[in-house]
Amino acid sequence: MYGLWLSRQAEYRNEIHMKPPEFLDVDPRLLHLPTTRPSGADPVKLQRQIARYGSSTEGMPPIFVYRGSDGELVIFDGVTRATRMAKLRPGDLVRVEVVGELRAPCRQLPTVGDRLP
């Protein structure tokens, strides 16, 4: 019983000391594509998002990214949103949330701008 109490106290302390989220405003064309989506956004899903939301960013959740060891950002969640913003609002910045760090560099991965339709 005492051990269970100690483990819960340790969990509580870890929750308090979590790193605060890091938000950045970046050009979506410069974000690197994940290895699971090297060709970019799914064209059907992209057209569906364009038809539904157009160039609006209202209510759009942040794009989740990881920071590579070289400082480059690679998309974890939001390839279609990033592509839509890069295509319809070139030069505008989008909000991303850095959710973690990678040990490997990401510079060799293609960017959203490289794969714009």
Predicted regions and their residues:
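A short, basic-hydrophobic beta/loop patch
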Residues: 59-116
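An acidic, glycine-rich, mixed-charge low-complexity segment common to nucleic-acid enzymes
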Residues: 1-23, 32-44, 109-117
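Short alpha-helix boundary/capping and kink motifs at helix termini
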Residues: 17-76, 86-87
